[in-house]
Design a protein with these regions (language model features):
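Short Lys/Arg-enriched alpha/beta "domain-start" segment
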Residues: 1-35, 130-133
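A short, Trp-centered hydrophobic/proline-enriched beta-strand micro-motif
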Residues: 3-11, 120-122, 152-157
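Short, flexible beta-strand-to-coil junctions
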Residues: 8-15, 45-51, 157-161
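Non-catalytic accessory segments adjacent to catalytic cores
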Residues: 24-130, 178, 215, 219-221
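Cytosolic ligand/metal-binding cores
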Residues: 37-39, 175-224
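Short, structured patches in soluble enzyme cores that scaffold and shape functional sites
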Residues: 47, 126-128, 157-161, 168-170, ...
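Short helix/loop capping segments that flank catalytic or ligand/cofactor-binding pockets
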Residues: 51-55, 66-68, 132-133, 167, ...
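SIR2/sirtuin-family catalytic core signature
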Residues: 134-177, 181
Length: 224
């Protein structure tokens, strides 16, 4: 029997995190978000759910709250001595390393496409391969992410079905207050501290009593 787990820290939650641990065989594969129904748990999903890449539901009712401490977290994760995936050695990486030259070539392709008006916007990312065969070190990486990003939602996921993922995001995709749902777009990163006048709000559009007069048209458009 092998355990999978999720560890997450809410924004501004101080020194506390939540651990959800579940037997690997009891994780639920979802091939559509409609399968969630009234399920209660942690959902890890790809951008596009397919037969080969389903969403995975951690629905264990046991959720332990513990302090952000390496020994405490490791003790909770290894609780009952189940064969946790963190006990295993990482497999050697045989893929292609994404070097600086490859990144520059991709960047130039993106830049040319934007200049030629073939696309309006592009996001270029890269991967970084760390040479470390001890999976337990990802817990230290999780703690470091919590320390460096106090206002972000930090998650560490580990299971055979998903692999090992460390996530950090300041973005609230969707929150509910009663029957009201609220979503946030991060496209506008301008200073939002000033309140605009009624005349200005009529001219450029009012968004939650914040000053958007200094925003670019791009940011105003993306925040609609």
């Amino acid at each position: 029997m092998k355990d999978a787990f999720v560890i997450y820290r809410y924004p501004s939650a101080g020194n506390k995190c939540v651990i959800v641990k579940q037997d690997e065989s009891s994780l639920k594969k979802l091939h559509s978000f409609s399968e969630l129904g009234k399920a209660d748990g942690f959902v890890f999903a790809p951008f596009c759910i397919t037969e080969d890449t389903p969403a995975v539901l951690f629905d264990s009712p046991i959720r332990r709250v513990t302090e952000l401490d390496y020994d405490n977290i490791l003790r909770e994760v290894m609780y009952n001595g189940n064969c946790c995936v963190l006990n295993e050695r990482l497999k050697p990486y045989n893929g292609k390393l994404y070097d600086r030259k490859s990144y520059e070539e991709d960047f130039n392709c993106f830049k040319a496409a934007i200049r030629e008006k073939r696309i309006d916007k592009a996001v270029l990312s890269r991967s970084l391969v760390l040479k470390d065969d001890n999976k337990k070190n990802v817990i230290r990486m999780f703690l470091k992410a919590c320390e460096n990003n106090s206002d972000s939602y930090i998650v560490l996921i580990s299971s055979d079905q998903t692999g090992v993922w460390l996530v950090a995001t300041p973005e609230v995709l969707l929150e509910r207050c009663g029957n009201v749902f609220h979503t946030i777009a991060l496209a506008g990163t301008m200073d939002k501290r000033l309140v605009i006048s009624d005349n200005e709000s009529k001219a450029i559009g009012k968004i939650s009593d914040i000053d958007i007069s200094c925003w670019s048209n791009k940011n105003i458009w993306e925040q609609q």
